[in-house]
Amino acid sequence: MMFILNYAVFFILMGLVPASSVQAHHSHSNYATTEYTHLEGKVTEFHWINPHTWIYIEVLDDQGKATVWALEGASPPELRRDGWRRDDVEVGDTIFVRCHQLKDRSNGCLLGFLTPEGGVEKEWD
């Protein structure tokens, strides 16, 4: 009986280990989630892939210099459930986003909301 109990405890604990690493993977602690950054830019790359979509946009800074921003988004299945389609965003499109910038203030964001040019703002996370 003790042998079976030991195995049961072992398998329960082993089941919890992957769950903790999955939660760590989905942490957004590297983003400043208490504030939004507003960006407008032209899409230079778009990756509709699991586990996260990625959009790269070229944004003009205050001096008119182009900088590239990396925008991390939700997974394709999540976005499809929210009404997004893969072809709603394409390279060359101008988009407007509200996102949570990286805490180190580099050019990266966790997408919150996206507005295609001439479209309606919708959640992207």
Spans of model-derived segments:
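Bacterial N-terminal signal peptides
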Residues: 6-19
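Short boundary/loop segments of OB/S1/cold-shock single-stranded nucleic-acid-binding domains
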Residues: 22-37
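Conserved hydrophobic positions within beta-strands
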Residues: 41-43
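Short aromatic-glycine-enriched beta-strand elements
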Residues: 49-59
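Short, structured beta-strand/loop micro-motifs enriched in basic residues and often containing a Trp
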Residues: 73-81
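Short nucleic-acid-contacting surface segments enriched for D/E, G, S/T with interspersed K/R
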Residues: 81-96
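OB-fold/S1-family single-stranded nucleic acid-binding modules
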Residues: 102-125
